[in-house]
């Protein structure tokens, strides 16, 4: 079958048409606006999952001990039209967080400490698992408390959640002195974790 090169076709003369066997380099010029078309296999735009869970109850910490934060978590109230998650949102059980969909996530752990004695560095940790069993620390941060006072410490990491059944996270803190607390609240974020899906895995 012979091929004919078409230089110009008036838009008013084409009702329906198919372009077959033509490389993208053969197409040039401005394309008309598409209205009422159904396009498939296009990447989704914007952030599809974002959530916050906060710690609700101020709690004293045991000196020289790493503590897993396994209770007193809640999602902020959505009824006041101020906070709203994006997408399905995270699930939490005994401090273990399950992701709603696969993807690359930015996970942040923000802890507000209060202390009444000098401290070495209080630490915070993000732990992750790839088998729903063994956890390893993927992010750690620390701050120095001096006498009576408060401080906020932040740790963060990108996580590749290729499997929502086995890849999960949890959060820990460490007190380097006596009389240390992490502050919780049920009406605002003081100690909390954020989860934002950035891209496909």
Where are these regions (language model features)?
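Fibrous stalk/shaft segments of extracellular and virion attachment machinery
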Residues: 1-48
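Self-maturation zones of extracellular/virion spikes and adhesins
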Residues: 2, 59-62, 121-123, 149-150
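Terminal (often C-terminal
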Residues: 41-120, 130, 139-141, 182-201
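Short, conserved beta-strand segments of beta-strand-rich sandwich/propeller modules, principally
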Residues: 106, 168-170
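Beta-strand signatures of extracellular beta-sandwich domains
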Residues: 125-129, 170
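Solvent-exposed serine/threonine-rich low-complexity stretches and specific carbohydrate-binding patches
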Residues: 136-146
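Short, surface-exposed tryptophan/glycine-enriched loops
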Residues: 148-168
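Short beta-strand-plus-loop segments that form exposed binding edges in beta-rich domains
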Residues: 172-179
